[in-house]
């Protein structure tokens, strides 16, 4: 149900999303972050309320139904009624790994907790704005079945999920918000507040360059308020130059170090689980290359887009990153020379091969500007580079090379 786009993005923690909500005046309650049991106790006292909800801050959903790897302690969401209890629960969470359906068996390390004011919930709703590849538009996904995983609702009660395709410029207008509120069964004060909050969430989506704004649950309270109780935001990596606050949240310890290294050279790198590595110029061609590898019976080991940076330094760095992945058994370089000349890329590939000292088979397919000059350089290099005549041939040779076949 969520975004089908391959766009690179990163997640932020819930407490960080609450700060962004505050920036756009989205109603999200009182929220304080703590990184030690003592800070949790102090946060509880500062809230000056008879009770609070304490939540583990990790990059995953399903925290309430999770468990802690080291101790078996249940749940990453607890209700506490005193500062001492807040400290006790924080101690169970901090420094431990929370395992949920979304984390895998090793779980995720919790380094912070968030204390929030309890909300007297009348109904839990689901609300998300995301980019939809099928319609090539932003869409809203809304449901009266909030507080549970939306995939489960889609599987068992698809009729309870409503999809609204938005105008990319106008977004959630008052009219659209009223339509959504009606579908969610909001009435009276809750209806009016729902219309306002949905428009604020659209402004947040656009203003923060988000690729996904998911609120689950979006709570209708007993007194008619509409509150963003739990939220998950994703942001387009390409917006880093104008979203300084948001990208300042980025925890580099949670990011693959090779992705960080690639960024320094203007490369777009996403690790995958296969054994045929790709080094391509252009995101569209990179996707097509991965498809060809799959069609040939293989699995891509990465998405690596040189973009317009197909220089010797960029190619060398790409090879360096790829060659350090032990699961890579072959590399496929697929270049279409437009602005970038094939002879320049060929020279870069040859120099990079020698500098890195590649130990795995290398398949190269060149097409476009100065392609014959590029192919000549590769032929005369004396290196064991496997040339491919077309995209299909390249994919087949790369998969065979990964299996140990000789050419």
Swiss-Prot record:
The EC number(s) this enzyme carries: 6.2.1.5
Swiss-Prot/TrEMBL cofactor(s): Mg(2+)
Biological role: Succinyl-CoA synthetase functions in the citric acid cycle (TCA), coupling the hydrolysis of succinyl-CoA to the synthesis of ATP and thus represents the only step of substrate-level phosphorylation in the TCA. The beta subunit provides nucleotide specificity of the enzyme and binds the substrate succinate, while the binding sites for coenzyme A and phosphate are found in the alpha subunit.
Amino acids binding Mg(2+): 216, 230
Catalytic function, reaction form: succinate + ATP + CoA = succinyl-CoA + ADP + phosphate
Sorted UniProt keywords: ATP-binding, Hydrogenosome, Ligase, Magnesium, Metal-binding, Nucleotide-binding, Transit peptide, Tricarboxylic acid cycle
Cofactor note: Binds 1 Mg(2+) ion per subunit.
ATP-grasp domain boundaries: 18-261
GO molecular function, one term: ATP binding
NCBIfam families: PRK00696.1, sucCoAbeta
Alphabetized Pfam families for the sequence: ATP-grasp_2, Ligase_CoA
Similarity comment text for this entry: Belongs to the succinate/malate CoA ligase beta subunit family.
Places the protein is found: Hydrogenosome
Gene Ontology terms describing biological process: succinyl-CoA metabolic process; tricarboxylic acid cycle
Protein name per the record: Succinate--CoA ligase [ADP-forming] subunit beta, hydrogenosomal
Lineage: Eukaryota, Metamonada, Parabasalia, Trichomonadida, Trichomonadidae
Enzyme class name: ligase
Coiled coil: none
Extent of the transit peptide: 1-9
Keyword Metal-binding in annotation: yes
GO cellular component: hydrogenosome; mitochondrion; succinate-CoA ligase complex
Binding site for substrate: 281, 338-340
Sequence positions that bind ATP: 55, 62-64, 124
Pathway in which this enzyme or protein is active: Carbohydrate metabolism; tricarboxylic acid cycle; succinate from succinyl-CoA (ligase route): step 1/1
């Amino acid at each position: 149900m969520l975004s089908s786009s391959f766009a690179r993005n990163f997640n932020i923690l819930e407490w960080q999303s609450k700060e962004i909500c505050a920036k756009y005046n989205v109603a999200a309650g009182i929220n304080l972050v703590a990184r030690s049991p003592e800070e949790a106790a102090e946060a509880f006292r500062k809230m000056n309320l008879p009770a609070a909800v304490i939540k583990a801050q990790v990059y995953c959903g399903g925290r309430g139904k999770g468990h802690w790897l080291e101790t078996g302690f249940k749940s990453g969401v607890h209700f506490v009624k005193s500062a001492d209890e807040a400290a006790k629960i924080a101690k169970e969470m901090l420094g431990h790994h929370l395992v949920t359906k979304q984390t895998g068996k090793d779980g995720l390390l919790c380094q912070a907790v968030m204390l929030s004011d309890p909300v007297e919930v009348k109904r839990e709703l689901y609300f998300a704005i995301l980019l939809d590849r099928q319609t090539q538009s932003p869409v809203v996904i809304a449901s009266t079945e909030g507080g549970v995983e939306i995939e489960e609702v889609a599987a068992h009660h698809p009729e309870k999920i409503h999809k609204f395709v938005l105008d990319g410029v106008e977004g959630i207008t008052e009219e659209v918000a009223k339509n959504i509120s009606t579908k969610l069964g909001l009435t009276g004060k809750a209806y009016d507040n729902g219309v306002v909050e949905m428009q604020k969430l659209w402004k947040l989506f656009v203003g923060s360059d988000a690729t996904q704004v998911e609120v689950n649950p979006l709570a209708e309270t007993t007194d008619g308020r509409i509150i963003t109780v739990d939220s998950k935001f994703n942001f387009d990596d390409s917006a880093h130059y104008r979203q300084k606050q948001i990208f300042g949240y980025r925890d580099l310890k949670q990011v693959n170090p090779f992705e960080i290294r690639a960024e320094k050279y203007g490369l777009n790198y996403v690790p995958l689980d296969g054994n045929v590595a790709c080094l391509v110029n252009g995101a569209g061609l990179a996707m097509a290359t991965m498809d060809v590898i799959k069609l040939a019976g293989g699995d891509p080991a990465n998405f690596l887009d040189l973009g317009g940076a197909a220089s010797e330094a960029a190619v060398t760095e790409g090879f360096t990153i790829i060659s350090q992945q032990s699961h890579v058994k072959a590399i496929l370089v697929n270049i279409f020379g437009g602005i970038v000349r094939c002879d320049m890329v060929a020279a870069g590939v040859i120099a990079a091969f020698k500098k890195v000292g590649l130990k795995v088979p290398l398949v190269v397919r060149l097409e476009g500007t100065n392609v014959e000059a590029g192919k000549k350089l590769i032929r005369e290099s004396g290196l064991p580079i496997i040339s491919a005549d077309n995209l299909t041939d390249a994919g087949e040779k790369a998969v065979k090379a990964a299996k140990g076949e000789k050419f």
